[in-house]
């Protein structure tokens, strides 16, 4: 698939927006689950340091790069290996002066045969300016996830961001 066919959707509702991506991954659901919930695996493709208290009501604490956003939140749904939903509260940062107080990320994994997973990632309750900036960034992170799962060299995040930003509104 080409990058355009992998692009996500930006849904704007007033001052808020939702980003939605769907990827078909040639890996079992359990492998994908580990890649999105295990801090050592997240560090490989999501450019972050993560602490995840994996349970309903648990917490997440991420420092996500390359900007180094500090993000915390409560786990809303912990349903291995199907659903991981958590708040995404980002502290103010030079690139995000007001932070993000209400955002939520939902990862849904649906088995498609024995060794394929459909990943749907929904990033909701983002302020509109943040969503417009994050849309190509999340695309780039998901491209890195796919490369990581395949065992391929990971694409440079900044180069991927630049390559896909024309697919999204600005």
Where are these regions (language model features)?
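A conserved amphipathic terminal alpha-helix motif
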Residues: 1-4, 125-170
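A detector for short, charged/polar N-terminal pre-domain segments
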Residues: 4-12
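Beta-strand/loop substructures that line and gate deep hydrophobic ligand-binding cavities in soluble
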Residues: 16-19, 92-147
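Short beta-edge strand/loop motif at the mouth of beta-sheet-based domains
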Residues: 20-21, 27, 31, 40-74, ...
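A short, structured loop/turn motif at beta-sheet edges
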Residues: 29, 76-82, 108-118
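Conserved catalytic core of Hanks-type protein kinase domains
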Residues: 35-36, 78
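Residue-level recognition of conserved beta-strand positions in structured domain cores
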Residues: 64, 87-88, 121-123
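Short, solvent-exposed secondary-structure boundary/capping segments
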Residues: 82-90
């Amino acid at each position: 698939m080409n990058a355009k066919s992998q692009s996500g959707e930006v849904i704007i509702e007033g001052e808020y927006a939702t980003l939605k991506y769907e990827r078909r991954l040639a890996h079992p659901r359990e492998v994908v689950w580990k890649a999105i919930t295990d801090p050592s695996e997240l560090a490989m493709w999501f450019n972050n340091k993560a602490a995840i208290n994996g349970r309903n009501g648990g917490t997440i604490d991420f420092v996500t790069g390359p900007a180094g956003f500090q993000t915390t939140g409560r786990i809303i749904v912990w349903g291995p290996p199907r659903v991981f939903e958590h708040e995404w509260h980002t502290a103010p940062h030079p690139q995000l002066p007001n932070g993000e107080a209400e955002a939520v990320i939902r990862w849904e994994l649906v088995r498609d045969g024995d060794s394929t997973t459909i990943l749907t990632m929904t990033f909701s309750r983002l302020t509109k300016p943040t969503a417009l900036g994050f849309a190509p960034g999340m695309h780039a992170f998901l491209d890195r996830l796919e490369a990581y799962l395949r065992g391929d060299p990971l694409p440079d995040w900044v180069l991927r961001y630049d390559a896909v930003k024309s697919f999204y509104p600005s």
